[in-house]
Curated annotation (Swiss-Prot):
Pfam families assigned to the protein according to its UniProt record, in alphabetical order: HSP70
Source organism: Vibrio cholerae serotype O1 (strain M66-2)
Protein name according to UniProt: Chaperone protein HscA homolog
CDD domains assigned to the protein according to its UniProt record, in alphabetical order: ASKHA_NBD_HSP70_HscA
Gene: hscA
Keyword set, alphabetical order: ATP-binding, Chaperone, Nucleotide-binding
Length: 616
């Protein structure tokens, strides 16, 4: 039977056309898709009523399988079955081999050193594999909602760097999806929780998924979601629990080496044991011909060191946010790994309150993303919710002496644009090198280099006369672009920062630890470098002045006095005493004051020559 569209005469049958939008939680272990229907956000299920899609792709010789069918192939066809591909996104093959030496895949490197998985269907890179997962989720959404998606919001860990975010967007484009926004996973959870409860105040979002851990401290007030601070580990999650259990079982069985099939069988047994121990005190195991029990106490002993790492990140995030644990009103639990009773107990003890688990921890991120997608698609024009994310590490620029000038401090809300003016160091300088760095330390050598580019075409001027405006802009997805503009000519250079691969697992945490551990040494090193730069400026300026006017304006004795002052300052500059260099600069300035006055008089006389008093 044909359906008739009925509307008032002269009025569209859909005066306020609802655009189809979805939120996608592209997870390490599992992925989900959700959408707002009839004003309520909910996850979309497959034909068997399952909301979760395992983040697994099998490239068999006969077909490509995604989700549950792919996971079934993991044990029998490990080389062609890719699990936890999210851990490979935006990383180099060298980094992957160092961090995950036991992966069963056959890797080779691309020309840029990025990983390629060799499968029965040919070479596949992490972006292509992720795209296949996104396609499966998009097909589910299209079938459920009855039309093509106008756009999606995809969630990423808060600690994903530029390369990992770009790779996620590239995967979405390959899947034919229009990305409305990338959204930090803890922030998505805050959206879902905040709208459901109407709570106001400081909230901690503890997100322990399959492959990543994030802690976010947020303030919810009158519809405004502000991330006060973030922390975490981009490679710590439930997968690590599984591997610890598998290693324990391997020792129990007495196996010294494993085939890929045996390794996968152990991982599967470990995962099932972890799930069983969520409800029971013991788990019965039958794997590789070995039968035995695994207790909740054994599990807790194994995972305690990893949980301690997450709580250290929580303590650091609270310090960054400037709040105490007792100021946190609620703790939101996100990620399937938070179902483990020991995790909930430890987090509850740390914050001094029972964590909230009323929203399904597997679904909360996708639901929050769906709510945000609905707003960005224009379906809620009156929505008052304002979302503010932050950058996890400071972004800066190298200045003379190897110093770092921070342009955007860490935990600044994004999107954001900040600019500073810089100038030339040498007379006649016509180009400037811009070195973009990331980190909390005072010296360039202690920070992470992101990119370099040059601004050419600066008009030749005296040192310090040119004005170069350097602008750092971070968009809503956390991607950075840097622009350098010479103000008098309009000459401009720009670069988008897209590193070839991301930070190693412990680099972010280590960078923050180092910034605190070496704070005093860094400030002393910075003070020394600053005095050396100033000494170089004074020396170069005075040498240039002597070459230009020394013979004309100074006696030989005066000239020798200044040369001795320069030599003394050079000697001090090459030393390690910042205070001595500072005093040497003052002494040199004092010794050259009379010479500077004579040069000024000469310049004035030259400017007035040939002009009458009336003209002046």
């Amino acid at each position: 039977m044909a359906l008739l569209q009925i509307a008032e005469p002269g009025q569209s049958s859909a005066p306020h056309q609802h655009k189809l939008a979805a939120g996608i939680d592209l997870g390490t272990t599992n992925s989900l898709v959700a959408s707002v229907r009839s004003g309520t956000a909910s996850t979309l299920v497959d034909s068997q009523g399952r909301s979760i899609l395992p983040s697994v792709v099998n490239y068999g010789a006969d077909a490509t399988r995604v989700g549950y069918p792919a996971r079934e192939q993991a044990e029998t066809d490990p080389h062609n079955t890719v699990i936890s591909v999210k851990r490979l996104l935006g990383r180099s093959l060298q980094d992957i081999n160092q961090r995950y030496p036991h992966l069963p895949y056959r890797f080779k490197a691309s020309e840029k050193g990025l990983p390629i998985v060799q499968t029965a269907q040919g070479d596949k890179n992490p972006i292509q594999i992720s795209a296949d997962i996104l396609k499966a989720l998009a097909e589910r959404a299209t079938a459920t909602l009855g039309g093509e998606l106008a756009g999606v919001v995809i969630t990423v860990p808060a600690y994903f760097d530029d390369a990992q975010r770009v790779a996620t967007k590239d995967a979405a484009a390959l899947a034919g999806l229009h990305v409305l926004r990338l959204l930090n996973e803890p922030t998505a959870a805050a959206i879902a929780y905040g709208l459901d409860s109407g709570q106001e105040g400081v909230i901690a979002v503890y997100d322990l998924g399959g492959g990543t851990f994030d802690i976010s401290i947020l303030r919810l007030s009158r519809g405004v979601f502000e991330v006060l601070a973030t922390g975490g580990d981009s490679a710590l999650g439930g997968d690590d629990f599984d591997h610890l259990i598998a290693d324990h079982l391997q020792a129990q069985i007495g196996l010294t080496s494993l085939t890929a099939e045996q390794q996968r069988a152990l991982i599967n047994a470990a995962t099932q044991a972890k799930i069983d121990l969520t409800e029971h005190m013991t788990a019965e195991l039958n794997v590789l011909g070995w039968q035995g029990t695994f207790t909740r106490e054994e599990l807790e002993n194994l995972i305690a060191p990893l949980l301690k790492k997450t709580l250290l990140s929580c303590r650091r995030a609270l310090k960054d946010a400037g709040v105490e644990a007792d100021e946190v009103l609620e703790v939101v639990m996100v990620g399937g790994s938070t179902r483990t009773p020991f995790v909930r107990e430890q987090v509850g003890e740390f914050f001094g309150r029972t964590p909230l688990t009323s929203i399904n921890p597997d679904e909360v991120v996708a639901i929050g993303a769906a709510i945000q997608a609905d707003i960005l698609a224009g379906n809620k024009p009156d929505a008052e919710m304002l979302l503010l994310d932050v950058i996890p590490l400071s972004l800066g620029i190298e200045t003379m002496g190897g110093l770092v000038e921070k342009i955007i401090p860490r935990n600044t809300t994004i999107p954001v644009a900040r600019a500073q003016e810089f100038t030339t160091f040498k007379d006649g300088q016509t180009a400037m090198s811009v070195h973009v760095v990331q980190g909390e330390r005072e010296m360039v050598d202690d920070c992470r280099s992101l990119a370099r580019f040059s601004l050419k075409g600066i008009p030749p001027m005296a040192a310090g006369a040119a004005h170069i405006r350097v602008t750092y802009q971070v968009d809503a997805d956390g991607l950075l672009s840097v622009t350098a503009l010479e103000k008098s000519t309009g000459v401009q250079a720009e670069i988008q920062v897209k590193p070839s691969y991301g930070l190693s697992d412990d680099e972010v945490t280590q960078m923050l630890k180092d910034s605190m551990a070496y704070a005093k040494e860094d400030m002393l090193a910075r003070a020394l470098a600053e005095q050396r730069v100033e000494a170089d400026r004074v020396i170069e300026g005075l040498v240039s002045a002597l070459q230009a006017d020394g013979d004309e304006l100074l006696s030989e004795q005066e000239r020798q006095t200044l040369l001795q002052a320069i030599e003394r300052l050079i000697e001090l500059r090459n030393g390690d005493n910042a205070d001595a260099i500072e005093q040497g600069i003052k002494d040199t300035d004092k010794a050259s004051q009379d010479f500077a006055s004579r040069r000024m008089d000469k310049s004035i006389r030259s400017a007035l020559a040939g002009h009458s008093v009336d003209e002046i």
